[in-house]
Amino acid sequence: MAQLTALDAGFLKSRDPERHPGLAIGAVAVVNGAAPSYDQLKTVLTERIKSIPRCTQVLATEWIDYPGFDLTQHVRRVALPRPGDEAELFRAIALALERPLDPDRPLWECWIIEGLNGNRWAILIKIHHCMAGAMSAAHLLARLCDDADGSAFANNVDIKQIPPYGDARSWAETLWRMSVSIAGAVCTAAARAVSWPAVTSPAGPVTTRRRYQAVRVPRDAVDAVCHKFGVTANDVALAAITEGFRTVLLHRGQQPRADSLRTLEKTDGSSAMLPYLPVEYDDPVRRLRTVHNRSQQSGRRQPDSLSDYTPLMLCAKMIHALARLPQQGIVTLATSAPRPRHQLRLMGQKMDQVLPIPPTALQLSTGIAVLSYGDELVFGITADYDAASEMQQLVNGIELGVARLVALSDDSVLLFTKDRRKRSSRALPSAARRGRPSVPTARARH
């Protein structure tokens, strides 16, 4: 038996008593070729799923094997109406997100989506966020592939490793400091969220119905921005997301403020960060640098193993409370995953695309997840069904945010400070001073 981490227990408790969808995440792989028969799928999935312990287990305070596991209770099969384009695929994804996972069974589902144009089909994996401590939905997809290599989406090698703590006394002192620190930070965030006027929140009552959309960005374009400014791909993604939400606020006639929007990021470990997105800045470079600096500061304050040292119920109650805040509290969960090390294949067929599905819950009106696959960085976006207009504004803003950064990453572009003095290249990391020309930018799939 394996225990939950403190943070994942909190995500599990975010499911409400009426069994609305809890914090579920997912990924969709678009596969070349005709969809296999149900018998073929059942044979392959049964063999591969049973090799992944979490997929045949249920949990309370720890993971235990589920008696009488039946694959057919977890697999759904749907066919898209003609023309089978991406708009129809996105509707099918949204439909899958509206269906809650059964908490009395292993917390995952697989949807086989047939009828995509171009002789293609798709497989959607949805898992509860409490399983993500062991694997993400993208990891699970990789484990189902022909090479069964769960490390296909493994973490980047440059991720900082947290050294183990020493004696029991230092561990206890660290535990106390972290508990007090995270409690204060989250309680402060909750207090601020409740006090924010509703007019500043991405709006309207939250429903169980969802919309899904994706924005694709050439990975070379993102790499050019990273190279120019000495930042990470995750920084670029968050800066683009910031522009997206700034666009929404301006479209509503609201003035973006420094405390307008906060995002919950679950890191590669078991911790979470709650940084503000700098929507108040119009300058895309200033936004990018602010995101980068805040991410670095959050990383220094919160080691990956932080919430594993936090008392279980304390952390669980915090996440539970955060999920129940009004919409203006936390309106987005931004997550990311590194690109796979090679192209994936399923039942002999090539995976053309992988689309991320952000954490989805009744209390969260908007979610964005970011995933790199092949030569693309993909933003997956979910929103309330009634928020179609604002979702399009968000998409447009993300596209604009990437386009502006790509344009500024060209060496022929001179960067100026606010008083029109040229920005010194010495202010940039060495990697930024070796910038390279930009390449074509974002495109949305509607």
Swiss-Prot record:
Pfam family, one: WS_DGAT_C
Alphabetical list of InterPro entries matching this protein: Acyl_transf_WS/DGAT (IPR014292), CAT-like_dom_sf (IPR023213), O-acyltransferase_WSD1-like (IPR045034), O-acyltransferase_WSD1_C (IPR009721), O-acyltransferase_WSD1_N (IPR004255)
A single MF term (Gene Ontology): O-acyltransferase activity
Top-level lineage group: Bacteria
Gene3D superfamilies the UniProt entry points to: Chloramphenicol acetyltransferase-like domain
Enzyme class: transferase
Chain spans, region Disordered: 425-446
Catalytic residue list: H129 (proton acceptor)
Similarity section: Belongs to the long-chain O-acyltransferase family.
Annotated protein name in UniProt: Putative diacyglycerol O-acyltransferase Rv3371
Organism: Mycobacterium tuberculosis (strain ATCC 25618 / H37Rv)
